[in-house]
């Protein structure tokens, strides 16, 4: 039986670089940092006083009455999905053939913390009746599904910082296995709050460059000292190829395969051997019926942690072999910060734009490239990609040892 092909027909985003895809992409190619000092009072009570907040507040894009009943992560999901759906041409589709798979690594944590404060300071009568649907990890997916009346299934993978990529992979399988014709997929996160930031700081996971926030996220730099927490979301409309052609849809590229693995090593540390990452790359290429020689670009997970960046780079070098020499590697968290469960989704949006423009975005803030990093990093300015048929990888990893690799192919 001929396998159903899956293509990307719509994109949406709200990020530290912009409130839509076009603005975000322009900022990325310009090497702009979305990291800024925090102005909230609580920021002065924790060791790290900066983060990558969204560039455009939801209050500038949504009605106040809608915002009041939604967690910030749900707001990001609706903003990005509305842009993506419009970009896809607002397709007419049988609702029973329309699905939603949108992930979050943490869910409505800011709602939980804010409502707990209200309970403690003002009493139970003032706790919002919207609290439970606002804090549910599946809230973003559920709200998007309700707005679009999706009936093929609404799902929320939760695999820490691999969640967004896993959501796209799940959506890919829904279409490939004939459970849906269109699936709205991606990931969101809104965790810039005192407790999550204090917790990550306690793990020594965050950069502490309070005096220079814009240069704090520095994947692959010899003096990197941790990641920068970001927020926002990315959404992709995935569609069965013949369905998209029949309605005359704009087609960005094809999702050709995915690879999943787990490390079985540690709850929070990467396996220094990189064996799990290598397996995920191998599985993804096999699923896509491609070889390492077909890959010209990779958007790395590269969060700017001392251990993680090198472990990933070594694993990629081992997985790609000598072909790694012609793979342009971008570490876009240097500009957006780390969106946790939204990272793999927004970075998939970036790969789709890279495929469209044939331009790999830069990695900024590398003063001294760590000599232990042996992949070809795109530094400081964008790099043109080859003409003709090309393929690219997006890899995402999460606490717990989750590894996800997605394969994108020109069409």
Segments from the language model and where they lie:
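Flexible, low-complexity linker/loop segments at domain and module junctions
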Residues: 1-8, 92-95, 288-294, 325, ...
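Short, well-ordered amphipathic alpha-helical segments that serve as non-catalytic structural scaffolds
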Residues: 77-86, 140, 167, 239-240, ...
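Conserved small-residue
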Residues: 10, 28, 81, 100, ...
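Acyl-CoA/ACP chain-elongation machinery
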Residues: 179-225, 258-272, 300-309, 326-376
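ACP-dependent fatty acid/polyketide chain-elongation machinery
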Residues: 1-66, 242-254, 349-363, 409-411
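Conserved catalytic cysteine-centered active-site region
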Residues: 1-4, 37-79, 107-170, 179, ...
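Feature captures the FAD/FMN-dependent oxidoreductase FAD-binding
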Residues: 74-95, 99-104
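Condensing-enzyme catalytic core mediating Claisen C-C bond formation in acyl metabolism
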Residues: 5-9, 34-37, 211-288, 297
């Amino acid at each position: 039986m001929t396998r159903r092909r899956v293509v990307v027909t719509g994109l949406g985003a709200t990020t530290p670089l912009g409130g839509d895809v076009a603005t975000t992409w322009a900022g990325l190619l310009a090497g702009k940092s979305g990291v800024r000092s925090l102005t909230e009072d609580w920021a002065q009570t924790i060791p790290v006083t900066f983060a990558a907040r969204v560039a455009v507040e939801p209050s500038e894009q949504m009605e106040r009455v809608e915002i009041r009943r939604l967690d910030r992560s749900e707001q990001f999901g609706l903003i990005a999905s509305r842009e993506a759906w419009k970009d896809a041409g607002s397709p007419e589709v049988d609702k029973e053939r329309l699905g939603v798979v949108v992930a979050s690594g943490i869910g409505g944590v800011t709602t939980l913390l804010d409502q707990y404060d209200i309970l403690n300071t003002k009493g139970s009568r003032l706790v919002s009746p919207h609290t439970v649907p606002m804090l549910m990890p599946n809230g973003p997916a559920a709200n998007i599904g309700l707005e679009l009346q999706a009936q093929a299934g609404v799902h929320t993978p939760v695999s820490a910082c691999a969640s967004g990529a896993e959501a796209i992979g799940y959506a890919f399988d829904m279409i490939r296995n004939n459970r849906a014709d269109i699936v709205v997929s991606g990931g969101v996160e809104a965790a810039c709050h005192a407790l999550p930031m204090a917790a990550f700081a306690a793990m020594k996971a965050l950069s502490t460059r309070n005096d220079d926030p814009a240069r704090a996220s520095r994947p692959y730099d010899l003096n990197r000292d941790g990641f920068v927490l970001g927020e926002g979301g990315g959404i992709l409309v995935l569609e069965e190829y013949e369905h998209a052609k029949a309605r005359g849809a704009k087609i960005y590229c094809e999702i050709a395969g995915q690879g999943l693995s787990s490390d079985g090593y540690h709850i929070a540390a990467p396996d220094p051997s990189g064996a799990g990452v290598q397996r995920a790359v191998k599985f993804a290429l096999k699923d896509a019926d491609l070889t390492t020689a077909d890959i010209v670009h990779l958007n790395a997970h590269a969060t700017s942690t001392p251990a993680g960046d090198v472990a990933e780079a070594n694993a990629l070098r081992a997985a790609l072999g000598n072909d790694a020499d012609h793979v342009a590697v971008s570490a876009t968290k240097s500009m957006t910060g780390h969106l946790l469960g939204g990272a793999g989704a927004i970075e998939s949006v970036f790969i789709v734009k890279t495929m469209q423009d044939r331009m790999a975005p830069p990695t900024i803030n590398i003063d001294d490239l760590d000599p232990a990093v042996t992949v070809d990093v795109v530094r400081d300015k964008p790099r043109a990609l080859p003409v003709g048929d090309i393929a690219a990888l997006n890899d995402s990893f999460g606490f717990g040892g989750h590894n996800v690799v997605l394969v994108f192919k020109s069409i």
